[in-house]
């Protein structure tokens, strides 16, 4: 049984912690999550497994960009490898995105690298904007002239609909209305959003 207080303490103290790894968020996006835990929650790795037709597999839940190993200290390639090899053998297929601080050996033929772009928001907007390339600045100007803007008051149902109508229509296992409703209800309840 996962001690969620200890888990969340680990994520809070991790140099690479993210919202995706907090227990409350994992409970929303994949209520059956499990974990690899080193010692007394020094390092942790959420496991997002399911079973279909008697075959266990790990997958990347919707609305979770990345997971991986979370630690208070920088992880070596060997330490990351130890966690990967500790994933239970019952998982016959694994599709799981490690966070950017989980460096792995390029020699592993079962690992595929994907591009991941993150924008560091520690700096003020003007500093960030000044460091954009010309193409990004041009695209921002087009968006502004088209009347596109940031909306902070969006309902969770709208986020779910945007996902379903765009990315979700290409994802075969995103057609279960009960899962969509549960995710929406959980986001409304846990994130303090409200319904119209």
Report residues per predicted region.
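A conserved beta-strand-loop-helix scaffold within acyl/acetyltransferase catalytic domains
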Residues: 1-54, 98-196
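Acyl-donor binding region in acyl/amide transferases
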Residues: 49-111
